[in-house]
Amino acid sequence: MQQRRPVRRALLSVSDKAGIVEFAQALSARGVELLSTGGTARLLAEKGLPVTEVSDYTGFPEMMDGRVKTLHPKVHGGILGRRGQDDAIMEEHQIQPIDMVVVNLYPFAQTVAREGCSLEDAVENIDIGGPTMVRSAAKNHKDVAIVVKSSDYDAIIKEMDDNEGSLTLATRFDLAIKAFEHTAAYDSMIANYFGSMVPAYHGESKEAAGRFPRTLNLNFIKKQDMRYGENSHQQAAFYIEENVKEASVATATQVQGKALSYNNIADTDAALECVKEFAEPACVIVKHANPCGVAIGNSILDAYDRAYKTDPTSAFGGIIAFNRELDAESAQAIISRQFVEVIIAPSASEEALKITAAKQNVRVLTCGQWGERVPGLDFKRVNGGLLVQDRDLGMVGAEELRVVTQRQPTEQELRDALFCWKVAKFVKSNAIVYAKNNMTIGIGAGQMSRVYSAKIAGIKAADEGLEVKGSSMASDAFFPFRDGIDAAAAAGVTCVIQPGGSIRDDEVIAAADEHGIAMLFTDMRHFRH
């Protein structure tokens, strides 16, 4: 049963006024009486719409600089009144039924994001009347429609037209879900902000306050259900943040191909975040969350050719990310050469998409061009808890490096060292990366001892016939013993970049000097677990 309810009276009170005039005009044209407050009422009146101020309806003025507007029985009685059950008491107290509530809330998130926002500014942007009306209308969704998103305006008008001015229970229930999601997210933002302010509020330093609230409330929106999770016996879904500010796998548009799997998304994220580190045309190939080939080149085709050479075997069934538009030449090279799960780039040319269309199972994503990296949080779920930390956006430049050996690196060694240092940041620890002429030639990932990662990188290079002599090596963390340096020297490495900080640094540096290796300290670690 559809349980339609006609919309005869609507209360509109919005902070974000995008589309509200057109929506109000559409409601009014369909005979809906309009109630409104403050700035919304003034805007509608300026546009010539017949609108009744809530203060005129209640006989009670707005007061306390707008803090009290809608907190009145004639408003909430009209929203909460159960049709057919509360009619008598509503009539006794001259309460008119309100069939639709259109509300969005004070911009708390935007306010606290502004530089220099004070606690007083934040407090004044905590909406009280708005959430109260939203919750009241959502609670009484059996009789009332609650609208919190301007993106729903057109669909609501269409349904009213299809149902003689009424909305179905299914629609009202869906709108109620959105309303409770909206208020939950809003309260979570406030709780997180206040929770992180507690020490500072008691006179402690800003540093003491930190950025982590005492209770962490997170709100993510489900983008899609997965066929399964990391393994076929696990159920899964993909949730994204609202208003993501940086090009990412979460914001990407899928242009073609099968639905993304859980592992596709995880691996695509790893590839995209790595390729973002490079200003020059770059390609990153990822397999099982680890880069298996990375290169920069004169073009993305050149970069892809060089990245592929690192490890063609592992590249099979991998994820390929570019930091430039996918062009026809690169698309053709990929499709002709290998099986690929996902290609992601800021954009793709029409010619490139015609080529990839021949392989309909290949997933092609475009994410838009990115600018500055946006600070944020990383999460790792543990049984019974959640680890939270800042995103690892740290990266050193040449001017921050310390040469700790007798020999200075050559210009090419230095370039390669900085290149493979960027790659090592995205390789699972213990991470070792060999690079030469701006391409990886061997990657050792995820080993329990650093020396074995170094040996594996050398084996990988030898297997592909890539010359290690004169290459640079990056290690994501310090060398606890000299054995990693000995292994690198045996392979032909002539420059090493690493954080330093081991109690045996002197032994490690001495080993480098014995082998004539230049060694650079970054004083920054990039563990990745």
UniProtKB/Swiss-Prot annotation:
Q: Which reaction is recorded as catalysed by this protein?
A: (6R)-10-formyltetrahydrofolate + 5-amino-1-(5-phospho-beta-D-ribosyl)imidazole-4-carboxamide = 5-formamido-1-(5-phospho-D-ribosyl)imidazole-4-carboxamide + (6S)-5,6,7,8-tetrahydrofolate; IMP + H2O = 5-formamido-1-(5-phospho-D-ribosyl)imidazole-4-carboxamide
> Which GO terms of the cellular component aspect does the record hold?
cytosol
Residue span(s) of domain MGS-like: 1-148
Task: Give yes or no: UniProt keyword Hydrolase.
Answer: yes
SUPFAM superfamilies per record: Cytidine deaminase-like (SSF53927), Methylglyoxal synthase-like (SSF52335)
Q: Which domain of life is it from?
A: Bacteria
Q: Recorded GO terms, molecular function?
A: IMP cyclohydrolase activity; phosphoribosylaminoimidazolecarboxamide formyltransferase activity
Enumerate the SMART domains for this protein.
AICARFT_IMPCHas (SM00798), MGS (SM00851)
The cross-references to HAMAP family, in alphabetical order and at most eight, read: PurH
State the domain notes: The IMP cyclohydrolase activity resides in the N-terminal region.
* Record-given protein name: Bifunctional purine biosynthesis protein PurH
